[in-house]
Amino acid sequence: MPNACPDGSIGPVRVSGIHHVGVAVADLDAAVATWGRLCGAEVEVRETVEDQGVETALLRVGDGRIELLASLEADTPVGKFLDRQGPGVHHVAFEVEDVAAELERLAAGGAELIDERPRPGLEGREVAFVHPHATGGVLAELVARG
């Protein structure tokens, strides 16, 4: 299986920065309170992303962001993740100028994709997910620059 990172066989994806780290949680309200107490995190956006079956809270932590994800149903990707692994880091999201172009670049290099084309995500931005097989074990999200 091709690997997107250490040997450079796929990409490079044109990344402008890390948009957020996604954390799967069982209870969104409790997690928001915990992160607020822990590091003064403040909610920037809180919304439901129906397409992905999650309620999310995007928290500002210094210069970075954490996206807390609570599953709306057990039979969603985040619900299955929570069932399999419990709460914890779910994905790393990279900000890119053009999600579709980066997906094409990855597909041409043989990367395993979860999404073949962009779909709506948090804040109405286009997003797409790259399978952990292509990244050495980490679920990666591409997020259109806002």
Regions found by a protein language model. Name each.
Residues 2-14, 18-26, 57-60, 67, 79-105, 128, ...:
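Vicinal oxygen chelate
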Residues 5-52, 76:
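Long, hydrophobic N-terminal alpha-helical segment
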Residues 22, 67-70:
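Short, conserved beta-strand edge motifs with alternating hydrophobic and charged residues
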Residues 31-34, 102-106:
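Hydrophobic side chains in well-ordered alpha-helices
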Residues 63-66, 73-75, 99:
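Short, charged/polar surface micro-motifs in flexible loops or helix N-caps
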Residues 71, 75, 142-143:
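Amphipathic N-proximal alpha-helical interface segments
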Residues 75-76, 121:
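Serine-centered coil/turn micro-motif
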